[in-house]
């Protein structure tokens, strides 16, 4: 059996970029009862995750844009898994960009706009089912996420 793959350490410039916006992201997540996942699977991003009352899971993703360094992309995704058919339906869109040289209130506005957009989405807004995927884990991840 092969040893598990190791994730590459997150570069210092990415950590520094998120350190500058961490208070805003952490405060927003706390206010809206969102789970923060930092650098999930080694990605240069923070994710604000939650389970939706409408079903499935959703995430507001704040990604480091490597070409510029001072710009963070804000995007949103909602997905619903059909565990029996091993398929997933989702919707995703970019909310906008945040220039770290501007006020933190600009980032908060983009986060709020993304969360509001997710809250407006209905199952009819989801795309077609994709899959089938390999066997799911026994317990869906959404079971441990805050419900919104």
Label the predicted regions.
Residues 27:
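Surface-exposed charge patches
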Residues 30-35:
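Short aromatic/hydrophobic-glycine micro-motifs
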